[in-house]
Regions:
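Short glycine-enriched, charge-decorated loop/helix-capping segments at active-site entrances
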Residues: 20-26
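A conserved catalytic-core segment of Leloir-type glycosyltransferases
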Residues: 1, 7-15, 27, 36, ...
């Protein structure tokens, strides 16, 4: 059985191309690092799929790309966007009240597609 990874990158301002590096504190070099990490993981023979899970944002101040539920990155890599919290963009420190809803959505999604995740990874630094 080949491995399936889920990487959480919660704030939502991440996409496969044209990264908005430096837009705010949530869009620094870590977004570039995360994209390189998931692509590298997917290119190993032991890995079948890498899902980058982030927040779906439907805000007129933010590019429409961040409101796409699924974005193909390359074979074995996709960005999945889930709605949790308000439609507008929120910096990561304000997402705490909505994480239970995201957890429920993730469990439901992976049950529905009958997929088991081998490893889940995140690099969160949330001030509570």
């Amino acid at each position: 059985m080949r491995l399936k990874f889920l990487h959480l990158h919660l704030h939502g301002l991440i996409r496969s191309k044209n990264l908005e590096l430096g837009r705010d504190a949530d869009t620094g070099g870590q977004t570039q690092y995360v994209l390189e990490l998931i692509k590298s993981l997917a290119n190993t023979s032991e890995v079948d799929q890498v899902d980058l899970v982030t927040r779906l944002i439907n805000d007129p101040k933010i590019d429409d790309e961040y409101s796409q539920e699924e974005e193909f990155v390359e074979p074995g890599v996709r960005i999945l966007r889930f709605k949790f919290g308000p439609n507008k963009y929120l910096r990561k420190e304000l997402l705490w009240p909505y994480l239970d809803h995201l957890t429920e959505r993730l469990i439901s999604y992976y049950k529905k597609i009958k997929s088991l995740i081998s490893f889940m990874h995140t690099m969160l630094m949330l001030d509570k």
